[in-house]
């Protein structure tokens, strides 16, 4: 089965996002339990398409792409802060816009 792919801009460069669990074939050193991977030198992001983790994994790997100097712990902290903030974001603003809500 072919993986779904999209192209997104990051830092004025085109990055390919591949929705499949990363494997050793994709990048040497991938661990079996990895659900995402950012390969900066190839401008590729791999994201396991599992519905329970796809959004957080996508966000996590994009943070790695945008801020390659950050440690894994810092990326996790950023990911959690952003997801928590969006969890509290008023749904009516998302659906109707600020002026209509």
Kindly label every feature range from the protein language model:
Residues 56-68:
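Active-site recognition of the HExxH zinc-binding catalytic motif
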Residues 1-53, 68-101:
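Metalloprotease/metallohydrolase-associated module, dominated by Zn2+-dependent proteases
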């Amino acid at each position: 089965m072919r993986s779904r792919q999209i192209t997104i801009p990051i830092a004025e460069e085109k990055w390919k996002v591949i929705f499949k669990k990363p494997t050793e074939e994709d990048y040497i050193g991938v661990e079996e339990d990895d659900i995402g991977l950012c390969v900066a030198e190839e401008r590729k992001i791999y994201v396991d398409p599992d519905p329970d983790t796809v959004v957080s994994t996508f966000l996590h790997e994009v943070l790695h792409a945008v801020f390659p100097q950050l440690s894994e712990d810092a990326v996790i902290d950023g990911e959690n802060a952003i997801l928590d903030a969006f969890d509290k974001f008023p749904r009516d603003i998302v659906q109707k816009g600020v002026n209509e809500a």
